[in-house]
């Protein structure tokens, strides 16, 4: 099957500065894929290149098999982008904005388009704002309109560039519920976010960028297991026996932390503590965390 997004040996230079250093990746149709990295890693440059807004210095980019340069109309038609910045035309209502956006892709006005716009407005809780001027909306409402704009031409591939930056919890939950529906319906989702828990919960595969390069790329589960460990936290009444000091990784008050690779090690560690004379009053197991993985990868 043709990849939804294909990036082959992409480089982008601004004079002596290298923004993208030979990036290659392939995202399958129907994937929910995260692209993570610190500010300046090259994520937005890569997205701009996919959208045809930035010409790369070398390499090829394709969306649903369409080259973003030689077949740019088809590539752009297959792509819907929710930008990081809130950009809007202050002279039009929400409904007018969506109609104009659809027109840019050659979609004629009519019952079919209006029905789809009404469905988008309902899904994004914008129905009561449909005829309001864009400048009258709150920041969160404007961001919902950006999502609707990205979807109004029904693209199979959707790019979300920091879609929940600066929005409240209610909007975040509403947006992710809708995006999950889109992914379940077969849409390919490419997400960039600094909320790593979102990427961990939503995405099946993750790539991490640093200084214009991909420094890690794998399934979410494999990344969590490769770069992070479960932690057994044990609360002990009294001092930790000296024989257990050297295997403890950290102490927080009365809680002692021990790294474990899998759950089968829990009873082994507890038995060793009891045998050494430790009086255990409480315990918990912390699962691997994407934030820890991210920090470990960036510090390598």
What are these regions (language model features)?
Residues 59-70, 74-75:
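Conserved ABC transporter NBD signature motif
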Residues 99, 103-106, 111-129:
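Conserved ABC ATPase "signature" region
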Residues 176-260:
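ABC transporter nucleotide-binding domain
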Residues 229-300:
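Short, charged/small-residue-rich alpha-helical element at the C-terminal edge
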Residues 133-137:
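Conserved ABC ATPase signature
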Residues 158-161:
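Catalytic Walker B motif of ABC-type/P-loop ATPase nucleotide-binding domains
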Residues 152-156:
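A short, proline-enriched helix->beta-strand linker immediately N-terminal to the Walker B motif
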């Amino acid at each position: 099957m043709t990849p939804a997004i294909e990036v082959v040996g992409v480089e982008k230079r601004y004079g002596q500065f290298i923004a993208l250093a030979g990036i290659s990746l392939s995202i399958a149709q129907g994937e929910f894929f995260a692209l993570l990295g610190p500010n300046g890693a090259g994520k937005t440059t890569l997205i701009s290149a996919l959208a045809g807004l930035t010409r790369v210095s070398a390499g090829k980019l394709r969306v649903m098999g369409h080259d973003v340069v030689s077949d740019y109309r088809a590539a752009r038609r297959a792509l819907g982008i929710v930008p990081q910045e809130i950009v809007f035309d202050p002279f039009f209502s929400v409904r007018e904005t969506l109609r104009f956006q659809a027109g840019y892709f050659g979609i004629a006005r009519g019952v079919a388009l209006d029905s789809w716009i009404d469905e988008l407005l309902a899904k994004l809780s914008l129905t009561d704002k449909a005829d309001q001027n864009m400048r009258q909306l709150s920041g969160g409402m404007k961001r919902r309109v950006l999502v609707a704009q990205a979807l109004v031409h029904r693209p199979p591939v959707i790019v979300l560039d920091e879609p929940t930056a600066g929005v409240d919890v209610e909007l975040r939950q509403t947006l992710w519920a809708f995006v999950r529906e889109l992914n379940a319906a077969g849409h390919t989702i490419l997400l960039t976010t600094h909320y790593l828990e979102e990427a961990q919960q939503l995405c099946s595969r993750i790539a991490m960028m640093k200084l214009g390069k991909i420094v890690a790329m794998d399934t979410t589960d494999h990344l969590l297991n490769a770069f992070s460990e479960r932690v057994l936290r044990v609360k002990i009444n009294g001092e930790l026996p000296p024989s257990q000091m050297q295997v403890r990784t950290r102490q927080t008050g009365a809680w002692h932390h021990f790294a474990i690779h899998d759950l089968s090690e829990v009873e082994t560690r507890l038995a060793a503590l009891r045998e050494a004379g430790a009086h255990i009053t409480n315990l918990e197991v912390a699962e691997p965390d994407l934030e820890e993985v991210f920090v470990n990868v960036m510090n390598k």
